[in-house]
Amino acid sequence: MLESPHIPVLPSEVISLLQQTKNPNPQWFLDGTAGEGGHSKLILKTFPEAKLILIDRDAVMLERAKKEILKEIGSLDRVHAFQMNFSEVDSELLQEVGCPSLDGALVDLGVSLFHFLHSGRGFTFKNDEPLDMRLEANIGGKTAADVVNYSSVLHLKKVFWEYGEERWALKIANNIVQTRHKKKFGTNTDLVKLVEASIPRKFWPKESHPATRIFQALRIEVNEELVHAEKGIRALAQCLGIGGVLTCISFHSLEDRIVKWTFRDLKDNGPFEILTKKPILPSETEIKENRASRSAKLRGLMKINPIKESRWEK
């Protein structure tokens, strides 16, 4: 199947925030979620003298991003690529590539459209695929099938409620446990059918599939997305140089809540300033051109000089 060209979310808004860096000659940026390389290409074009640390936890996505950058920029000479989680970024990694500190960083917390349409890992409802959902499938770790087949009713209920905000969490969890005694869940289709049967049709959401919240919850659980989001935001904030900017794009309320609260905590307890009093949202035009952007929210944070002159000092 022919893939549609990738369109990065809030592209000009991300660049506008990164351009607020106080370094008049910015040298180092980091894209913590390379994805299809859309934002990375914009960063490299906007800052032609800068180098980019390119990170993605999915080896497939990292290679796709590098390929896209090479195609459009013509070279990977300014790119240092690593397969890892952005929550693992630290001063040692920066030292490894000769980076003293970051002038700007971006994390896009959404899952790539590629994962839903082409990964074959069970993120979608449309194709019959293994119930996997791992973003680091080449490294190992638990799958969505493991969670569904071996978790207790209470744990499943907690996952579905806390990560999916699913009102039918307990009923779905009970039905899963009853069903798996007869046959283990192996594919996404198995789970979709159970969720559809568990929720009365009159309560199905009008604008999304009834299994959307369950699949979101399992994906978050399998990949520990919210844990890594907070840890990663804190890690990248510490890697900023004075005047450096961190930008975060979120796609649902759980992610945005973590970004908002973590930014606020960093501001209250460290040398940071929030650049976005309210999240930046996509325009109506962007939403029409790129439906994937419709729930996106962008927030920005700057590291400031911790030494402030007292107003009483002369």
From Swiss-Prot:
GO molecular function: rRNA (cytosine-N4-)-methyltransferase activity
Cross-referenced InterPro entries: RsmH (IPR002903), SAM-dep_MeTrfase_MraW_recog (IPR023397), SAM-dependent_MTases_sf (IPR029063)
Keyword DNA-binding listed: no
Main subcellular localisation: cytoplasm
Record: residues binding S-adenosyl-L-methionine: 37-39, 56, 86, 108, 115
Localisation: Cytoplasm
Catalytic activity: cytidine(1402) in 16S rRNA + S-adenosyl-L-methionine = N(4)-methylcytidine(1402) in 16S rRNA + S-adenosyl-L-homocysteine + H(+)
GO cellular component, one term: cytoplasm
GO biological process, one term: rRNA base methylation
Domain of life per record: Bacteria
Annotated keywords: Cytoplasm, Methyltransferase, rRNA processing, S-adenosyl-L-methionine, Transferase
SUPFAM superfamilies registered for this protein in UniProt: Putative methyltransferase TM0872, insert domain (SSF81799), S-adenosyl-L-methionine-dependent methyltransferases (SSF53335)
Keyword Transferase included in the entry's annotation: yes
Residue intervals passing through the bilayer: none
EC number(s) reported in the record: 2.1.1.199
Function: Specifically methylates the N4 position of cytidine in position 1402 (C1402) of 16S rRNA.
Family the entry assigns: Belongs to the methyltransferase superfamily. RsmH family.
Protein's name in the database: Ribosomal RNA small subunit methyltransferase H
Organism the protein comes from: Leptospira biflexa serovar Patoc (strain Patoc 1 / ATCC 23582 / Paris)
Organism phylogeny: Bacteria, Pseudomonadati, Spirochaetota, Spirochaetia, Leptospirales
